[in-house]
Amino acid sequence: MRARETRKNYQCLWRWGTMLLGMLMICSAAENLWVTVYYGVPVWKDATTTLFCASDAKAYDTEVHNVWATHACVPTDPNPQEVVLGNVTENFNMWKNNMVDQMHEDIVSLWDQSLKPCVKLTPLCVTLNCTDYLGNATNTNNSSGGTVEKEEIKNCSFNITTGIRDKVQKAYAYFYKLDVVPIDDDNTNTSYRLIHCNSSVITQTCPKVSFEPIPIHYCAPAGFAILKCNNKKFSGKGQCTNVSTVQCTHGIKPVVSTQLLLNGSLAEEEVVIRSDNFTNNAKTILVQLNVSVEINCTRPNNNRRRRITSGPGKVLYTTGEIIGDIRKAYCNISRAKWNKTLEQVATKLREQFGNKTIVFKQSSGGDPEIVMHSFNCRGEFFYCNTTKLFNSTWNENSTWNATGNDTITLPCRIKQIINMWQEVGKAMYAPPIEGQIRCSSNITGLLLTRDGGGDKNSTTEIFRPAGGNMKDNWRSELYKYKVVKIEPLGVAPTKAKRRVVQREKRAVGVIGAMFLGFLGAAGSTMGAASITLTVQARKLLSGIVQQQNNLLRAIEAQQHLLQLTVWGIKQLQARVLAVERYLRDQQLLGIWGCSGKLICTTTVPWNTSWSNKSLDKIWNNMTWMEWEREIDNYTSLIYTLLEESQNQQEKNEQELLELDKWASLWNWFSITNWLWYIRIFIMIVGGLIGLRIIFAVLSIVNRVRQGYSPLSFQTLIPAQRGPDRPEGIEEGGGERDRDRSTRLVNGFLALFWDDLRSLCLFSYHRLTDLLLIVARIVELLGRRGWEVLKYWWNLLLYWSQELKNSAVSLLNATAIAVAEGTDRVIEVVQRVGRAILHIPTRIRQGFERALL
């Protein structure tokens, strides 16, 4: 009974089984995906490109020549835009940054270009007869830097050629001791020559040349972008989670200095130390301070310049007279601020090197530019001794809490002949600057090196000031930037396949996307970012156009120059590069048949070997950057398939156009074709009538020639009667039957009407026959089709019934088996339960039997 009840309960479930089978068949069917092209996606790749400069037009004095040539830069944007890229992580590496190399090359080129038109110092490469000049040094005190050392300034006389080359004249000038060297073969110690005369070409800086640093903004051309890391404790190497995109960097002052970094940017929170490899003592350590330390430098004595003419257009400027006290140049730094800064730096170094004692010492030796802190102050090159700055020891218990106005005075020396830092074999002569010189700068960073080769178990680490490689100066400002190339073309799988259909253009519904930057949707999913394609594509083109206008204005502003500066050349390169990139993208879109489209479907099937992720995971969980990295190895293959597909499609369209008139029968019924049909009909009828007239005339002419006069066209010719129908009646009685006659043509209109009537009747009969035939064929086809449908319907009913019966039988058998098994299981469980329940009874019976 239980099995029968189960069978009855499961008999009604065959419908559910059928539905489940259908669902499985639908789900198992593979869904075709097709490649879709998107233009304007927020994707970028690391790149190396030509950067151009932007600078404030009012940042320099127009009366002097600015060595940085910022007048050739484009104006800075008054409202610079910085778009934060949410949910984006990017790798940065300040030690392998092409922006640093590019800035270094630019500064070298600017220095070289500023010296090209200047006078060479070859006439001064002669024997100098020099004596020591002390002036009134004995009357000075040490309160402001101390007296000048003995032999610090030399009073030299020499012979120099005049405008007439075979004549010489006697001249004199004052030179600093660092700028002259004694001649070895002279024991009088009065013969000297200028330093570097035997190894370098010395060029005098042109009059009114200013070395005052002016902020330079490096900008990326259209089609490129600059990514900026905003992590406050970023080490300069590794991943950055707070990324934004900018078109230009902040204003970077190209300060050429050693040991101390001047007038740079500060850390936002605490002191940051950066190095390519802290364990390698050969690597320079860059220290970025969080609070600047002011350094004030002075050259007290008052110099007067003297002109020495050595030929037409060759004027040498030397120190002709020193007025007032001769005292050293010097720099003052607040002791409290400096020691507080060193304490913070030592704390960071201890954290990096395992809480060891940090010792700062002076430079270990080398060129004067490295041993001393060298920099330019109002046109004079200062070389300051920093021993007082780097002479301290810091351990865990070392702190500096003192405050006050105590200052550290750094003795400085001035050089006029500078060994060019950018390349070997060149030197520069800086003419003396008249008047007293004062300059104030901010120390924003340090360049340090760590001593190596000591005991690894030592508890002390020694650090010394370093410098000389100007790339470290630029690297300290460009550490948070990198250049990327925008790749607006993206491919992804969708369900849409290209169709040639008529469709209306619809506007994008998301107005808020207009305010996003080009890469503002970089952190969004692919589905969310795809709605901003219009904005991004428009910004790409408008950015190119705007940038071209800015570059053209900058180039026009320097047309009066005989030679473009390095900035002008870079602007031209950036202009050409931007247009080339845009045209390349448009060319690819044209090759793929996607010109003017932001979303372009194709007929290329998506291969799961490229990516087997589902559409939901791709469009709702991945960003365009993540997707681009996944299919990067297959991009070139996909591009090739898109091109081949478009070529095949164009070939098919060409073949189709050759059969265009037969493409659609509905075109035969258009009003234009009907008018053409009527015209053809009129021409045919007119031709027939014309032929009829011609043949009638020819027949008449032929009969006239034979001597026959035709009857009138109005005469009715009796028709011939048969032999059984005589024309008369016997005995002449009775009525004559109506005569039959053939009607002749009655004029031209009658002829036209007769032919037209005959043609219409003929056409009517033929069309009627054709319609009857077509109706018969349609009837036969309908009957046969209906029979076929009935046959298939009966077949479907038969197999569905068979499937139903099979499913019912299967379910019944399953139910019976389950029911029988359930009965056995229940019976076994009952027996086990009874046995357990009877255990006490059996025990009692056993005890009773034992007692008996």
From Swiss-Prot:
Bias (Basic and acidic residues): 722-739
Signal peptide: 1-31
Membrane spanning stretches: 681-701
This protein's UniProt keywords: AIDS, Apoptosis, Clathrin-mediated endocytosis of virus by host, Cleavage on pair of basic residues, Coiled coil, Disulfide bond, Fusion of virus membrane with host endosomal membrane, Fusion of virus membrane with host membrane, Glycoprotein, Host cell membrane, Host endosome, Host membrane, Host-virus interaction, Lipoprotein, Membrane, Palmitate, Signal, Transmembrane, Transmembrane helix, Viral attachment to host cell, Viral envelope protein, Viral immunoevasion, Viral penetration into host cytoplasm, Virion, Virus endocytosis by host, Virus entry into host cell
Extracellular side of membrane: 32-680
Keyword Disulfide bond in record: yes
Region annotation V3: where it falls in the sequence: 297-330
Name used for this protein in its record: Envelope glycoprotein gp160
Gene: env
